[in-house]
Design a protein with these regions (language model features):
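Conserved beta-strand positions that form and line the central face of beta-propeller blades
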Residues: 48, 190, 313
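Residue-level signal for alpha-helix termini/capping positions
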Residues: 69-70, 138, 282-285
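Metal-dependent phosphoesterases centered on the DNase I-like endonuclease/exonuclease/phosphatase
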Residues: 238-315
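Residue-level marker for buried hydrophobic side chains located in beta-strands
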Residues: 112-113, 146, 291
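Structured beta-strand-rich core segments of catalytic domains in phosphoester-bond hydrolases
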Residues: 77, 83-109, 119, 124-126, ...
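N-terminal membrane-anchoring alpha-helices
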Residues: 2-106
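Short, conserved clusters of charged catalytic residues that mark active-site
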Residues: 44, 128, 132, 272, ...
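Enzyme catalytic cores with a strong preference for nitrogen-chemistry domains
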Residues: 12, 23, 30, 37, ...
């Protein structure tokens, strides 16, 4: 009797532990899925869960498979509820390509290209050795091209210079605007087939990153185009090596502290920068708005959610 009672108690403890583990995994998974709704300046943990969402997704799949094999109907109902709740965010993270919907004729359509060119690969452009990035942009067929990190070199043998950029692309894009934001930091450029009526830097708190708002006359209609390059995490190879070493050593506390110290300031910067851009969009009223660029964040991030609030995702 004592042995049977002990077995019963052990079984109950195991079930409780499994339930607690399931709730912890599912809770973290849902918090990561909806992390974009929580400002990092108020609570930073959801931002980290959103960043590591793929790992949480794998864990949630594992928990679901376990309860399928155990065939516990109550736990399976819980899993079904979790998947149903997270479905909208899964479609944000993994957008499904549906049949192309035509919103008008070919003449009415607008093709946008957003490209972080990383200083055009620091490679020059000549007739005998053309720059691959410039070639891609020229052949893209885009009506408007938003470029981030469009740093132009002073030496034509060390990279793309302003004169080369304009002369090579002028036939396709007669309207070109290049602005170095935040005291000469990252360079943002807009190449357009339509007249650029105004270009103004958006004052974002950052050392090198930034954003620019353009008013473009597209077929007689003014459109606000915002080219965004949000704060970078500035992760170096040595950082990755340190994190990997801490993970291998099983030093979870030091790994957590290292990640928090490195990533938290950027998450908070994204929060502030996204709010500024959101307010600008709202102040524009009911006019046409296009936002694109390098957000340096995930599709589930607060930055993506806040900037995109009230807009339609093109993906």
């Amino acid at each position: 009797m004592k042995l049977r009672a002990l077995f019963t108690i052990s079984s109950r403890i195991a079930r409780i532990l499994l339930l607690v583990g399931t709730l912890l995994v599912s809770g973290a998974y849902l918090l990561g899925a909806y992390s974009g709704y929580i400002p990092p300046v108020r609570w930073i943990i959801p931002a980290f869960l959103g960043l590591f969402f793929p790992a949480l997704l794998v864990a949630q799949i594992g928990v679901t498979i376990f309860w399928l094999l155990a065939w516990d109907k109550r736990r399976l109902l819980l899993m079904a509820a979790v998947w149903l709740i997270s479905l909208p965010q899964l479609l944000v993270y993994f957008p499904i390509s549906r049949a192309e919907k035509s919103l008008g004729t070919e003449e009415e359509s607008l093709r946008i290209l957003s490209y972080n060119v990383c200083a055009f690969g620091f490679k020059p452009h000549t007739k005998t050795s053309p720059n691959a990035t410039l070639q891609y942009i020229k052949s893209s067929g885009a009506d408007i091209v938003c470029i981030q990190e469009a740093m132009l070199n002073q030496n034509p043998w060390a990279g793309v210079v302003s004169k080369t950029l304009r002369s090579y692309l002028d036939e396709d894009y007669p309207y070109i605007n290049v602005i170095r934001v935040n005291r000469g930091g990252s360079t943002l450029a807009l190449l357009s087939k339509y007249p650029i009526k105004e270009a103004k830097e958006i004052p974002l708190p950052s050392w090198v990153n930034g954003a620019v708002a353009y008013k473009v006359d597209i077929r007689g209609k003014e459109t606000l185009v915002i080219n965004v390059h949000l704060e970078s995490f500035r992760l170096r190879r040595v950082d990755g090596e340190d994190y990997l070493r801490l993970a291998k050593d099983g030093d979870a506390i030091r790994l957590k502290d290292a990640l928090r110290a490195k990533l938290s300031p950027t998450f908070r910067s994204h929060n502030i920068q996204a709010n500024i851009i959101h307010d600008l969009i709202q102040s524009y009223g009911s006019g046409r708005v296009i936002v694109c660029g390098d957000f340096n964040d995930t599709p589930l991030s607060y930055a993506r959610y806040k900037i995109g609030e009230g807009l339609e995702d093109a993906f």
